[in-house]
Amino acid sequence: MTTSLQDGQSAAGRAAARDSPLAAQVCGAAQGRGDARDLAPAPWLHARALLPPPDATRGCAADRRKKKDLDVLEMPSIPNPFPELCCSPFTSVLSAGLFPKANSRKKQVIKVYSEDETSRALEVPSDITARDVCQLLILKNHYIDDHSWTLFEHLPHVGLERTIEDHELVIEVLSNWGMEEENKLYFRKNYAKYEFFKNPMYFFPEHMVSFATETNGEISPTQILQMFLSSSTYPEIHGFLHAKEQGKKSWKKIYFLLRRSGLYFSTKGTSKEPRHLQFFSEFGNSDIYVSLAGKKKHGAPTNYGFCFKPNKAGGPRDLKMLCAEEEQSRTCWVTAIRLLKYGMQLYQNYMHPYQGRSGYSSQSISPMRSISENSRVAMDFSGQKTRVIENPTEALSVAVEEGLAWRKKGCLRLGSHGSPTASSQSSATSMAIHRSQPWFHHKMSREEAQRLIIQQGLVDGVFLVRDSQSNPKTFVLSMSHGQKIKHFQIIPVEDDGEMFHTLDDGHTRFTDLIQLVEFYQLNKGVLPCKLKHYCARIAL
């Protein structure tokens, strides 16, 4: 595992480092580490030519000398017409161009699924990584690369799933599957994959973190994260978990302790003394999975389950099932195990999209508007002379009016023959405009919405809009905040014969759902946070 960061970090990388509260500290901690793989000899150094036996060598030496002398006497010396080519540095280049080397990378066909169960077959080299597969699918489907696309390993027979880390070899993951297992690779967004680098305070609760040595003063979540990435000291994660007893269906509540060497449990209450700690699992030869339906599949006390599964193919008996009391506790355990298993490699995966972009500005790191759009200004053409609108409030009102005009034109196009009335425009607006938006999900239940948000990451601001199941002809905004999912009813309000949508009992009104979503993407309002990432179902 590579444990060093590149020194010559680009401007985009430094900008990303400033956004992360940990970047400056981690970059300093990563210096001075080497990679032993850089010193590995080339494969051709290990090959040995087949030598003839010593007796045969001595017996043929005299014959070769005689034959050489005869050849020299019989054949006259012919001058070389192109002496400059004998020592030309381009000779090897020409030879390589005329006789290309055979590609030694074997290719295999893999099948990748999306949320709607559509799939796509890809022919990939045997050494392709999960990041490269995601990039290939992004290019083939013309998606926007916002660095949240992720490859998942899905095990339906045991109800488990895990994030395949960006640096992992996909073919190696597939080689660990059993012949009769119907496992799948899923391609979807995961906004929470590296969220702990941006907001570590949500991932390490104070009551779950302790330190082997005494510390001076309070330790911040950023410092805790830095300790996970260092090689000297590691924090300890502790707390009660439900563990499934081997070979039984029963679960037992035990006090667990996570250390660098592995996961332990106490045989005597909450004691951390070595004589009371018993080894439970290590990280090197196993992967951490999240349980999708723990109660139904494994009879767990809660649905916040996770487990250790050996890398090699094995049955359900090899699983070490655990279960937390709440989502925040499970997230803390899983995140800490990932950090202890991969260490600095995770930080390198997080920083990889921002490195090596010296030829680009910081605006090219994330999907943004083009320079031509950013340079536009609001203009007023109503008077005799055109003028630039410098007042931001006036400019905003103009933009809203233009948006409403665009929506009315869309309603006219959606109407039937002839000029539609105001009521038909209103119905067309409510029925058709939001249907084309990726954040809107028609006829989605509350349970399906929660499952989709959890799949794409419990990050603050992840949201979707859906039809209300309890109140027909109304809508619900489902969003994530504080690692919990909240649902807000979008209430219809009528004023002077026109219908509006509101979240705050009519104090803020919107003519359609698009305007409502755009407003709360810029303003917190009555919501716990702004809307940041929408959940969308893609088709491959």
Swiss-Prot record:
SMART domains in the record, alphabetically? Answer: PH, RA, SH2
Q: Name one Pfam family in it.
A: RA_2
Region span, Disordered:
1-23
Q: Which UniProt keywords apply?
A: Acetylation, Cytoplasm, Endosome, Membrane, Phosphoprotein, SH2 domain
Highest taxon in the source lineage: Eukaryota
Q: Where is the PH domain?
A: 234-342
Q: Which GO terms describe its biological process?
A: insulin receptor signaling pathway; negative regulation of insulin receptor signaling pathway
- Please state every residue range assigned to the domain named SH2: 439-535
Spell out the family assignment given in the record's similarity comment. Belongs to the GRB7/10/14 family.
**How does the record describe its quaternary structure?**
Interacts with the cytoplasmic domain of the autophosphorylated insulin receptor, through the SH2 domain. Interacts with GRB14 (via BPS domain); this interaction protects the tyrosines in the activation loop on INSR from dephosphorylation. Binds to the ankyrin repeat region of TNKS2 via its N-terminus. Interacts with activated NRAS. Interacts (via SH2 domain) with TEK/TIE2 (tyrosine phosphorylated).
The name under which this protein is listed is: Growth factor receptor-bound protein 14
Supply the source organism for this entry. Bos taurus
Q: What is the lineage of its organism?
A: Eukaryota, Metazoa, Chordata, Craniata, Vertebrata
